[in-house]
Regions:
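Short hydrophobic alpha-helices and adjacent helix-cap/hinge residues
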Residues: 1-287
């Protein structure tokens, strides 16, 4: 990671704080709310990178600003209540760790700035108006790799030449999952393969979903890029190994947890990346 180049995703929230605010008493310090669909344990590395980026800007937690954290532990249905808690705290900005958290935050408030390091299809999903000018109160970064689904299919075929059946571990309650699944299914057909899906929407679903794919005798499994599946990367790697299912991922973090191979982005880098357009969220560009 090019740490010197990366500082914060806050889209100007920190940079725009007046100088006087930096020296105010603790009760007046700017408040950042971290909202995640994952677990605190899995998020620790991302939090560390964010705080390191803030330190590069000269902001230190507990001195110049305060943080509150809310984690859904992989249960997306907990996010609305957690978001309501966050909004009642009246933070200066909500840092939504993934698009599912950004959706929950957007439903809860139209005034508090919301920044996310992992937006996906945000325009098509109606979260922002455009990448150049998001509009509303949401901005962030879209860590999308052009041609990612095609590359995942390519890797699947390299792992097992002649692959005929590709399993998809999906998470349909995450807004960005269905478009991924549809694209992968279409691409599988173009190479003469069949795609079989098994849905996991809470951590307890993962073992059963992988068992279902094993029962379908899939040759390889592609794990979709969602918050819950990412935070469950260790469980997925363990279960896939036990069922002898080769797996392809879109996030490097899956491989660090024991997965086979990934092609995609390093989310920890994106979490502390500099956002070049640092005005208010309605004007800030997504990058």
């Amino acid at each position: 990671m090019r740490r010197r180049e990366v500082i914060t995703l806050l889209g100007g929230a920190a940079a725009a704080w007046p100088l006087g605010a930096r020296a105010e008493v603790a009760s007046k310090r700017p408040l950042i709310a971290w909202l995640s669909g994952g677990t605190a344990q899995f998020s620790a590395g991302f939090v560390d990178n964010f705080l390191r980026g803030m330190r590069d800007l000269g902001y230190i937690e507990g001195r110049n600003f305060d943080m509150v954290y809310r984690f859904a532990d992989g249960y997306g249905d907990r996010l609305p209540a957690l978001t309501d808690e966050v909004v009642r705290l009246k933070p200066d900005v909500i840092l939504a760790s993934a698009i599912i958290a950004a959706f929950a935050a957007r439903k809860a408030t139209s005034t508090i700035p919301i920044v996310s390091p992992a937006l996906a299809d945000a325009v098509h999903l109606g979260l922002i108006a455009s990448e150049a000018r998001p509009g509303g109160n949401v901005t962030g970064i879209e860590p999308y790799v052009e041609g990612l689904p095609a590359k995942q299919i390519e890797f699947a075929r390299e792992i097992l030449p002649g692959v005929r059946t590709i399993g998809l571990l999906t998470n349909s309650t995450d807004p960005k999952a269905p478009p991924q699944a549809q694209e992968l299914e279409s691409l599988a057909r173009t190479v003469g393969a069949k795609a079989v899906s098994a849905d996991a929407n809470v951590p307890e679903d993962i073992n059963g979903a992988l068992q279902a794919l094993a029962g379908e005798r899939v040759d390889v499994v592609i794990v979709l890029q969602t918050s819950m599946l990412l935070s469950s990367s260790q469980n997925i790697a363990t279960a896939a190994l036990a069922k002898r299912l080769p797996t392809v991922y879109g996030y490097r973090e899956h491989v660090l947890a024991g997965g086979l191979i990934s092609y995609g982005v390093d989310l920890r880098w994106f979490l502390s990346r500099r956002l070049l357009c640092r005005q208010n969220p309605a004007r800030s560009c997504t990058g």
